[in-house]
Amino acid sequence: MSEFDDAAVRMTAGADAISEASALVERLNDDELIDLLDGDVPFWPGITDMTSGGYYRHAWPASRNQRTGIPGLAFTDGPRGVVIGNATCFPVAMARAASFDLALEEQVGAVIGREARASGATYFGGVCVNLLRHPAWGRAQETYGEDPYQLGEFGAALTRGVQRHVMACVKHFACNSMENARFRVDVTASDRALHEVYLPHFRRVVEAGVASVMSAYNSVNGEWCGESPALLTSVLRDEWRFDGFVISDFIFGLRDPVTSVRAGLDVEMPFAQQRANELRRALAAGELSRADLEAPALRVVATLLRFAAVLSASAPPITVVASAEHRALARRTAQESMVLLTNRDALLPFDATSVRKIAVLGRLAAVANLGDGGSSAVHPPSVVTPLEGLRAALPDAHVMHHDTDAALARDAELAVVVVGYTKADEGEFVDPGTSAALFGLFPPMDDPRLGRDAPMPDLPPAPPSAPLERDEAVMAVGGDRRSLRLRPEDEALIEEVAAVNSRTVVAVMAGSAVVMPWIDAPAATLLLWYPGMEGGHALADVVFGAVAPSGHLPFAIPRDETDLVHFDADAAAE
């Protein structure tokens, strides 16, 4: 057994994690100590692998030490499922918040943790609890709404479930509630606003025992979040007594490696990038002491020891990934997430036995529309589209489908219009112009330790992946929304279909609020969200009464965009 394993055994007999971790950290030489404080993959080989799809192929290793047996981290992302391999894709987090079912969210977390472990990961970075300040935020779908209490309770539930199998990480700490300007915006907030509005949900997840916290890209009150002693030390550790470790957001999460160590950031993710050379220089120059470097290493190793019993258990077989049981939970979650916004004359539930002819319209009806295409993207082995779900529920009916031909609805017993957004309209966003200003954070391409020719370390085993066909017309652009309304052609289609068929149901796919000036035209309106791999079946279940639509909005929907304050997506007012 390794030295780490011996320490883990002593932990089961009542040994103290800090004492055992201290003994291990003291055994590390200076190079090993510094290597514990960033990713294991050198930057240029790593970024090449990541941008060619590696983000979705394997977990990302960090903080390993082979000599002492410190296992380190094997990171995968979320939150709608495990992003590596072909995992179960649940509805997005905002949809799950609409269920108001904490027990269900904990079950979702347990499945995600189980699939993460089966896929070679030990660390899940998908507990996102950033507060929804404005529905135009492009990554609203990854969080749970606009209420700090609900955010905290759902984040805690997901954490409890995930940590049955792997470590969890809550993100993005803090005030990361806009996308386009996240790399440069400075959020100014009073202590009262921070502690009453923007931080309580993080505290709740910390109190639930989360292993780790991820800092945010933006700055708060003049300090980059990855270099903020106010956030990472004063609030997180001194006030909240957090005893886990802190990682940076990926690639652009810190600007000054030395300052980040002093502030309380423990691990630079996901590569050996800025710290690898700069911390060696700072240690040699006396800018940092060995004790400065031992403190973050101690927090990482102590957390690994606390989770040793969970992580040393045998990993589930890969067959659990997207298993029938997990798909069934994805379907149930989509059912409970759906929100019935209007239902004139009790149109729903509709009697399926009376349907001889149904018109399914809208450009999203036959699209595998799962949400954001960035770091949270999940690639399930199959997706049930709204059209497929409705067709499966009506095996004897004539199902007519067209993206735009409203006339199809004229003679149908029921018309269903599927409209909304895709990953092209909202989601994660890296502006090439903005990222160019951050290229200075990259090491030289010929760096012997981090450059193109640096050797790749052994990576965690990658699960098998099957390709999934996608609608090639749906291109990932994302970012913050420029409007809260549907596309003009979608709004026009709704009006046209409702004008020729009084039994029209509109299903809206989105990650947060949509302004609906057309809402009185159709008989019924459902908020379908990005409903996951079983969303089409869940839609049919609700429309035809197999289940009741029990979801409730986790935010307010304004009647008009002007009812909200201006959303300065580009931080142009700074």
Where are each of the predicted segments found?
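Glycoside hydrolase catalytic-domain context in secreted enzymes
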Residues: M1-E574
